[in-house]
């Protein structure tokens, strides 16, 4: 089956952190060598006693963070991190700061940057600040709302209180344009419908990014994915971490040429369970809706059973009233690939 190019999804409006194309006024390319700077800041009422070198090793998971991006991108993206060790003290107590609004978050970074007058923050792609109490939050805005800095604007930066490399990966992926897949903001319908299958949904359980996010970032080569609009197709679906073969199938829901919503089929990745990697290999089916903003359920997994047991196995059939196709899983091979039949409705 010849691979067809997947269209850019139509957001049908100005959607913040969409599953469609990244906003070029905020986000840079997700290909190539990226420079990040890691800072350490605390407060008079939240004094950090841990050595910043130890803190840096912990939050990066002794290399887990860098390895994750290198492997998930198939070597197309590397992140070099420069540390500025030593805790710098902010002028007010922790309760006087917040990352909950754009204005308060921006002002927090303005003060943090002032603590480092000799550093040129414009030289870095990503700015990461370790600090207690403020939580884990990524800032990303167009110039009119961006962080003012020496007559310029900085569009993206993050602060992190967690010491999990997967939480840092989640926040870093926000700096790259990905939305939250967990639910907030009073959204009707299922809560956290992407389950443990992507870092943007569950940084504590997921081991990587869904195929769609690898596609969005430009990491998944053209011959590793295909776009099906009609007919019945039998094909071998290879795991995303394989070196060859079709690993992602996309089927449009609403428009063949310029869809805003698609269904995606791929082989599931391992998930984490109590510090162990739990294999749950099978066929994963989910929808992607570019009209929905961060936190509004832009990705929905359609599970075989529950979200922890989402992958379909040999002999299973996926058929749903909302889906533009049906799927039969015919066989699972020793290399983790699956033979499937896709019939577009």
Language-model region placement:
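Zn2+-dependent metallopeptidase catalytic core
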Residues: 2-169, 186, 254, 272, ...
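Extracellular hydrolytic enzyme modules, especially secreted metalloproteases
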Residues: 121, 126-274
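Residues at the C-termini of beta-strands that transition into short coil/loop
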Residues: 42, 203-204, 289
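Short intrinsically disordered coil segments
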Residues: 53-58, 214-220, 300-304
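Non-catalytic C-terminal accessory/binding modules of secreted extracellular proteins
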Residues: 3-17, 49-50, 83, 141-162, ...
């Amino acid at each position: 089956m010849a691979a067809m190019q997947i269209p850019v999804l139509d957001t049908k409006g100005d959607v913040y952190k969409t599953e469609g194309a990244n906003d070029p006024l905020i986000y840079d390319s997700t290909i190539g060598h990226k420079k990040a700077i890691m800072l350490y800041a605390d407060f008079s009422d939240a004094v950090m006693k841990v050595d910043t070198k130890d803190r840096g090793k912990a939050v990066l998971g002794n290399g887990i963070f860098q390895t994750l991006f290198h492997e998930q991108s198939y070597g197309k993206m590397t992140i070099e991190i420069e540390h500025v060790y030593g805790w710098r003290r902010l002028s007010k107590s922790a309760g006087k700061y917040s990352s909950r609004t754009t204005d308060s978050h921006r002002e927090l970074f303005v003060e943090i940057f002032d603590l480092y007058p000799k550093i040129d923050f414009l030289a870095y792609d990503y700015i990461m600040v370790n600090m207690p109490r403020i939580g884990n939050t990524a800032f990303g805005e167009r110039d009119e709302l961006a962080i003012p800095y020496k007559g310029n604007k900085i569009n993206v930066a993050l602060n992190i209180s967690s010491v999990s490399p997967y939480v840092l990966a989640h926040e870093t992926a926000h700096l790259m344009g990905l939305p939250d897949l967990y639910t907030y903001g009073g959204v009707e319908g299922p809560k956290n419908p992407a389950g443990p299958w992507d870092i943007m949904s569950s940084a504590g359980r997921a081991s990587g990014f869904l195929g769609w996010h690898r596609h969005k970032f430009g990491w998944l080569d053209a011959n590793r994915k295909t776009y099906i609009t009609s007919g019945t197709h039998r094909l071998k679906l290879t795991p995303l971490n394989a070196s060859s073969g079709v690993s992602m199938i996309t089927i449009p829901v609403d428009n063949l040429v310029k869809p805003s919503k698609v269904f995606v089929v791929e082989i599931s990745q391992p998930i984490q369970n109590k510090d162990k990697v739990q294999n749950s290999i099978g066929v994963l089916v989910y929808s992607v809706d570019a009209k929905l903003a961060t936190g509004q359920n832009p990705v929905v997994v359609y599970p075989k059973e529950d979200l922890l047991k989402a992958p379909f196995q040999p002999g299973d059939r996926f058929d749903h009233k909302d889906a533009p196709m049906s799927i039969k899983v015919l066989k699972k091979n020793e290399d983790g690939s699956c033979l499937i039949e896709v019939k577009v409705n």
